[in-house]
A protein has these predicted regions:
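N-terminal signal-anchor transmembrane helix
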Residues: 1-20
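Catalytic core of membrane glycerolipid acyltransferases/transacylases, capturing the structured
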Residues: 1-2, 21-81
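A generic local structural motif
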Residues: 7-11, 36-38, 88-90, 145-147
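Short, solvent-exposed coil/turn elements at secondary-structure transition points
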Residues: 14-16, 56, 77, 164
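Conserved acidic residues
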Residues: 20-21, 156
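A cross-family acyltransferase "interaction/gating" segment
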Residues: 42, 46, 54-71, 96-183
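A Trp-anchored, charged/polar loop motif used as the substrate-binding/catalytic surface
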Residues: 81-93
Length: 183
């Protein structure tokens, strides 16, 4: 497969056939948001319901179209976590065989600066610090929405997208100036 003049190698694609699954992709960039659509939803004729941060509603397209579809835009501040968890679980209701749900377990794009900021805020949390030390290119999962999705799962398969190569496109400017592909 070729996209943005990049070549992709996909292993195990046969396992994606059948009823739509729950998607949990790594989130390292703006560009990697298209991976589930291009390599999963479109080829298999599936629709995904998305859990997205409410800050994206500043984009009029996402505000208008995203709210007309069964997606959820969550407040990540933690002010109303229980409501957000209920909203994520509700995405599972009424799923057809060709509909799945996508959540980014990390809750944000990975960057070294975000990782180090989290380390500073949680310096007294030994378990989290150990996790940060083990997973050098991941943010720890934010468990509220992910667990709500899993708890309300009626038996759908889980698909994890553990991709690499998009780290250089964590900001919109990287996409425009070609810096993420070494231009």
């Amino acid at each position: 497969e070729v996209l943005f003049q990049l070549r992709f190698e996909i292993t195990g694609a046969k396992a994606l056939e059948g009823q739509a699954a729950l998607m949990m992709p790594r989130h390292a960039s703006i560009a990697d948001t298209i991976i589930p659509m291009v390599f999963y939803a479109i080829p298999y004729g599936l629709r995904l319901r998305y859990v997205l941060k409410q800050e994206l509603l500043i984009d009029p397209c996402l505000d208008i179209v995203g709210n007309r579809l069964p997606n959820l835009f969550v407040d990540r501040s933690g002010q109303d976590s229980e409501s957000a968890r209920r909203g994520v679980a509700a995405l599972m209701h009424g799923l057809g065989a060709n509909e799945g749900v996508l959540i980014y377990p990390e809750g944000t794009r990975f960057s070294e600066s975000k990782r180090e900021a989290l380390r500073g805020r949680q310096r007294d949390n030994a378990a989290l610090i150990a996790q940060l030390d083990r997973w050098r290119l991941l943010m720890p999962p934010r468990l509220g929405g992910t667990l709500a999705l899993l708890d309300s799962n009626p038996g759908r398969d889980l698909v994890f997208c553990a991709h690499t190569g998009f780290e250089g496109s964590s900001h919109f400017s990287n996409l425009l100036n070609g810096g993420w592909v070494g231009a």
